[in-house]
Design a protein with these regions (language model features):
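Acidic/His- and Gly-rich active-site-bordering loop/insert found
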Residues: 2-110
């Protein structure tokens, strides 16, 4: 099924696990941490000609990106987070986003992904 580019963009983000381990050792390694998701976002930002780097904890990095606009006098700061809460209680596959009755379901779909 074909979706609008913005919906597919969000589906691609949801499909990348970025679970905050919250100090727990029972979170599977393939979903714990934000590194894969941060790398994906960084590459998308670079594709938009922004300078983007990962900083901080290698497994739970932050992204710092900067765009210079000729003649601009104002600064815009966008602050968000990359992690999601654990998926223990989800009844659907949290990283296989589905659309049902016009709503998108998946971990992070109603947060900052």
């Amino acid at each position: 099924m074909s979706h609008r580019p913005s919906v597919q963009f969000l589906r691609d983000y949801i499909a990348i696990p970025s679970v905050n381990p919250m100090g727990r050792d029972d979170i599977p390694a393939d979903v714990a941490g934000e590194r894969r998701y941060a790398e994906h976002v960084r590459e998308q930002l670079r594709g938009l000609s922004l300078d983007a780097e990962l900083v901080g904890d290698p497994e739970r990095p932050s992204i710092v990106a900067e765009a210079s606009v000729a003649g601009a006098t104002d600064t815009l700061l966008v602050a968000s987070h990359l992690d999601t809460v654990p998926v223990d209680t989800m009844e659907i596959d949290p990283f296989d986003p589905v659309i049902e009755d016009g709503r998108l379901y998946g971990r992070g779909s109603c947060d900052t992904k």
